[in-house]
Structure formats: structure tokens, C-alpha cells
Amino acid sequence: SRWWKDLDFVTTLPYARDRAVECYFWTMGVYAEPQYSQARVMLAKTIAMISIVDDTFDAYGIVKEFEVYTDAIQRWDISQIDRLPEYMKISYKALLDLYDDYEKELSKDGRSDVVHYAKERMKEIVRNYFIEAKWFIEGYMPSVSEYLSNALATSTYYLLTTTSYLGMKSATKEHFEWLATNPKILEANATLCRVVDDIATYEVEKGRGQIATGIECYMRDYGVSTEVAMEKFQEMAEIAWKDVNEEILRPTPVSAEILTRILNLARIIDVTYKHNQDGYTHPEKFKPHIIALLVDSIEI
């Protein structure tokens, strides 16, 4: 999109993933209906932006820099930019500008106030990224329970689910309040995303010296092999799927339209991490799906 090209992160932040097309493909799995075009664009931009933030924590910086970056995002004030090193200034300004754009866009329908909920989720995930970065830099390995309590947020699904409602005119403040309580279906979805991601990315993270991974934490806590830990995480994914389906079928205070976004976010995980491979980080795995959906015509 023009927005992504204008940011030019490919040049200014060469460590970051360039995944604009993959981000939009992801959102097509969340809502394919034409009336959700605004929602798709907002969600795609957020996925692209959180990838930049995630890659910043993964690939760059020292604890002190991450601490200042995290604090600046909690304060959410452009005046904080002067505290940051140059490479962090780029993503910080882009992040604040993006949410300003959301507020301006939603103000046309009198809904700018709901952007607050998405901002709070962004602040939350950044706090949790900071914890993970400290673990990595300091060589700390948490217990698997401590790991998961932090890693559910860094799955991105608290943030992305909240963001998925921004462009839906039917999503009211009450829906955002409900989501902010972390209902069971959201917890299950975040768990699903987390453990499936951990299985798919284990070898890559191990190769770059990451010891505080879910699989490694489970292996140490229970004295088991990699294969057993992977099987346990797969079992956790299956339980999470059952919880998602159960919550979809039972009476809830929100409509099917609202719940379907959560269900579809779960479904797209199956595509992204098909055969335990990370299709987002390695887009060649995604390419056949993208071509089939957005390029090839349907034969009649």
C-alpha cells in the first residue's frame, strides 16, 4: 500500500520484515466480506506495525534502550521521541501517527473513543516484549508457567482481536469493554496462537541462541525431550481449539458477528503455521495461498 511504501521501513529499518502483502492476506482470513474493507486495512496496518516493533526488540538494542522505548510507548506522547536512539525514533513516530490516523478516520462515525482500547493493547504487548528481551539478553529461563503468562500477550492476539473491531461499525464500546476482560474465547485464541507459533519457530529461535522459548522451558521444567514437549504443546493447541468452539456455540453477551472475528483469527493460524512452518516469517510458504486468493482467477 501507499502507506507502507511512504514509511519506507525497508530502507530505514533493514532488520525489519517487509510483509505488507502477507499482512493483508491475514486480514482476508478474518473478514472477506466487502463491507469490512476499512477493518481489513486497519488490521493489516496494525499487523505490519507490530511486526516492526517485534523485530526491533528481537534484533536490536540493549536493555536500557528497550526500557526507554517501552516507557515512551506507555506515555504515548510525541515529546518522548527525543529520549530515543535514532532507529527507535522511526518506529515510535510511525506508531503514534498510525493511531492518530485511526482516531481521525473513526471520528467521522463518532467512534474515535474506541481507539483507546487498541492503544492499551499495544502498550500491553510492548511491556511483554520488553520482558522477553530482558530474558534473552540476561540469559534467563523462566518456568513454563511464567513464560506463558507473559507470552499470551506477545502472541499478538489480544492486540489483533481488539484491533479487528476498530473498523467494524457494529462494534460498540460495550464490545471493547467485554474484550478487555479477556473472556475465555480470547484466552483460548491467544493460547492457540502462542503454542502453535512456538512449535513452528522453535528450531529458528534455538539457532539464534534464544533459550527462553516455550518448548525449552517445558523441557527443563519436566525433564523431557524436544519431541515430548512439542507433543504437549500440540495437545494444548487442541484443547484451545475445543475451548474456542465451545465458546462460539454457547450463549454470550456479544453477537455472532463479533465472535466470528475471534474464530477467524484462530482459523488463519492454521494456514499461517501449516505443517508446523512459519509462513509469515518465511513468506515463500504463504505464496501459493496468496496467488490462489488474490491473483489467479476462479475457473467456472
Curated annotation (Swiss-Prot):
Gene Ontology terms: biological process: terpenoid biosynthetic process
Compartment list: Cytoplasm
Keyword terms: Cytoplasm, Lyase, Magnesium, Metal-binding
Main location: cytoplasm
Cofactor: Mg(2+)
Record: residues binding Mg(2+) 2: 54, 58
Positions bound to Mg(2+) 3: 197, 201, 205
Record note on cofactor: Binds 3 Mg(2+) ions per subunit.
E.C. no: 4.2.3.21
Described function: Sesquiterpene synthase that catalyzes the formation of vetispiradiene from trans,trans-farnesyl diphosphate. The initial internal cyclization produces the monocyclic intermediate germacrene A.
Reactions listed under catalytic activity: (2E,6E)-farnesyl diphosphate = (-)-vetispiradiene + diphosphate
Residues annotated as binding Mg(2+) 1: 54, 58
GO CC terms, sorted: cytoplasm
Identification of the protein by name: Vetispiradiene synthase 2
Domain remark text: The Asp-Asp-Xaa-Xaa-Asp/Glu (DDXXD/E) motif is important for the catalytic activity, presumably through binding to Mg(2+).
GO MF annotation, one: vetispiradiene synthase activity
Group of enzyme by EC: lyase
Top-level taxon: Eukaryota
Pathway it works in: Secondary metabolite biosynthesis; terpenoid biosynthesis
Natural source organism: Hyoscyamus muticus (Egyptian henbane)
Family recorded in the similarity comment: Belongs to the terpene synthase family. Tpsa subfamily.
Induction data: By elicitor from R.solani.
Listed InterPro entries: Isoprenoid_synthase_dom_sf (IPR008949), Terpene_cyclase-like_1_C (IPR034741), Terpene_synthase-like (IPR050148), Terpene_synthase_metal-bd (IPR005630)
Residues spanned by motif DDXXD motif: 54-58
